[in-house]
A protein has these predicted regions:
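Feature marks extracellular polysaccharide-active and adherence modules
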Residues: 81, 104-106, 142, 150, ...
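N-terminal secretory signal peptides that target proteins for export/translocation
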Residues: 1-16
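Beta-solenoid repeat scaffold
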Residues: 48-51, 55, 73-82, 87-128, ...
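Acidic, glycine- and Ser/Thr-rich low-complexity intrinsically disordered tracts
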Residues: 38-55, 118-127, 429-437, 442-527
Length: 527
């Protein structure tokens, strides 16, 4: 399924193999071009809701949830009284047998059906599992497995002043053999409290862990050097699934890495991030208390699929305003850290300061990482606004790397910055096997720019080994500075969008860029 998605635009049946062939056949450049390799797909799994059929254990207000967790057998359902409060920490025991233990609301039938995202408006029909001060609501033991929480509110208890993680899956495991596994949060409301320091919603350091159809918000810490996340993982084999959620946090809405995995086999792997809404409140801009960085960050991750999401609002504040980062980091104990085989396909970015920051290695002078390889950024619609004074860089490529495909993206750049760019490249290492094709950019002050050498062909020759740069539409830049086979209209009107002022950036009938891509498709994103 992933490979067809990677190659899909209007024709989902086209294979990834054909995409590679098309990209390899793009216009010849002054440097002989090779086809960049596509990302390897993640291992995926089915997290669908299946109505349970086992014994029912009912837990009313004032009764023991931990006793129910201890006594339940795989296949049973624990029904918690809606509106009741259960204060943890609760441990999910390791049970023998097969099947799942469901933990559900007594008013589950009043909640949206499977496949539908919940919101805070549904909280009245949910029981509450709360975290006491400084502790978790739910934790795992070695090999906890097959728990599904459906229609539950999870949060710090009222009156708490700090919480590190509402839900902690994982125990700093040093081997895949002890990971918790098969744990799902389905239609849950996971949140921080307005007047406390709440660092994370769910740590997902297990295998076959999913968060689906849920609402996650309110994670912020009143210290500008403390990062917060809605969802986070750093130490797991995966697979992981994040599907159809609303996710909000002050620093990184979702992050992978940021702490050193305990073994090379525990770099987060096989991650599916699909159909979510990542959102930052604009009120964070005026606050001096919180670290505000990006919407999605990969510091250590392999085989990732990011598709069909909305990413909304990302300002310059604690960082430079990039919405999505692929930047490998090693804190000193994990030289195996890597960001590789990552596909960013068919997403919408709204009101972001800058777009994508991709690094090949950790920054010079810091502990080493493995090299970033096989990155695909395709069919995304990106609204770069320079929010809160960001530079308006659509792409940034630093510190080398290999096999990057940037293809069929539409970037509407309205940043007022005098240094806005289609891309900035800064590196002491060259990037090999680089494909930049069929992209459409509405504005930039410096075009595709290489630090210290200028734009266009000079930047490509200076910073890339084996590159293809073809059939891009870049408004207002000098054609003579670029390889042949690209387009440089003077203004937006010359592109002929369906409704530019109304935010519809598809090409209208009669646009000179209809069917003009290397693959015969419209230039720009083809949803």
């Amino acid at each position: 399924m992933l490979h067809s998605m990677l190659s899909a635009s209007r024709a989902p049946q086209r294979s990834a193999v054909r995409l590679c062939a098309v990209l390899a056949a793009a216009a010849v450049t002054p440097v002989a071009a090779l086809a960049a390799a596509l990302p390897a797909p993640p291992q995926t799994f089915d997290s669908s809701y299946v109505a349970p059929r086992g014994a029912i254990l009912r837990v009313a207000a004032g009764q023991s949830l931990q006793a129910a967790l201890n006594n339940a057998r795989l296949g049973d359902t624990i029904v918690l009284q809606a509106g009741a409060t259960f204060t943890g920490p609760f441990k999910l025991p390791n049970k023998p047998g097969t099947g799942w233990i469901y933990v559900v609301s007594s008013r589950l039938s009043y909640l949206p059906p499977p496949g539908t995202r919940v919101s805070p408006a549904n909280a009245a029909n949910m029981p509450k599992i709360l975290a006491p001060n400084g502790l978790n609501a739910l934790t795992t033991v070695a090999n906890s497995h097959h728990f599904r929480f459906v229609g539950i509110e999870l949060a710090p208890a009222p009156g708490t002043t700090l919480n590190y993680e509402v839900v902690a899956i994982g125990n700093f495991d040093t081997s895949p053999a002890t990971l918790a596994h098969h744990i799902v949060f389905d239609r849950c409301y996971v949140h921080g409290n307005p007047n406390s320091n709440d660092r994370r919603g769910i740590e997902m350091d297990g295998a076959y862990v999913a968060v689906v159809d849920s609402y996650i918000n309110g994670f912020q810490w009143a210290d500008p050097v403390v990062d917060t996340q809605g969802l986070w993982a750093f130490n797991t084999t995966g697979p992981l699934q994040i599907r159809n959620n609303y996710i909000e946090a002050a620093t990184e809405n979702v992050m992978f890495g940021g702490a050193d995995s305990r073994a090379a086999a525990l770099v987060p792997t096989s991650i599916e991030i699909r159909n979510n809404h990542f959102f930052k409140p604009l009120s964070l801009i005026s606050s001096t208390n919180y670290a505000v960085k990006n919407l999605l960050e990969f510091k250590a991750a392999r085989r990732v699929w990011v598709a069909g999401n909305i990413f909304e609002n990302n300002p310059l504040k604690s960082q430079t305003g990039f919405a999505l980062l692929i930047t490998p980091r090693n804190g000193g104990r994990a030289p195996w850290s890597v960001t590789s085989d990552i596909a960013i396909v068919g997403n919408t970015f709204i009101n972001v300061g800058s777009g994508f920051n991709v690094a090949g290695f950790n920054d010079p002078g810091y502990p080493s990482t493995l090299m970033t390889q096989r990155i695909l950024i395709r069919n995304n619609v990106v609204g770069v606004t320079g929010l809160n004074g960001a530079d308006g860089r659509e792409f940034q490529f630093i510190n080398g790397g290999s096999d990057y495909i940037i293809d069929h993206n539409t970037i509407n750049n309205t940043a007022l910055s005098r240094i806005s760019t289609v891309a900035v490249v800064e590196s002491t290492r060259k990037i090999s096997n680089f494909v930049f094709t069929n992209n459409l950019s509405t504005h930039s002050a410096y075009g595709f720019f290489g630090s210290g050498v200028g734009e266009g062909t000079r930047a490509l020759n200076a910073y890339f080994t084996y590159w293809t740069f073809s059939r891009n539409v870049i408004l207002g830049r000098p054609a003579a500075s670029y390889p042949g086979g690209n387009f440089f209209p003077a203004n937006v009107a010359a592109v002929r969008f369906v409704n530019y002022s109304g935010g519809n950036y598809a090409l209208a009938a009669g646009s000179p860029y209809n069917n003009a891509g290397t693959d015969g498709m419209d230039i720009g994103a083809n949803p």
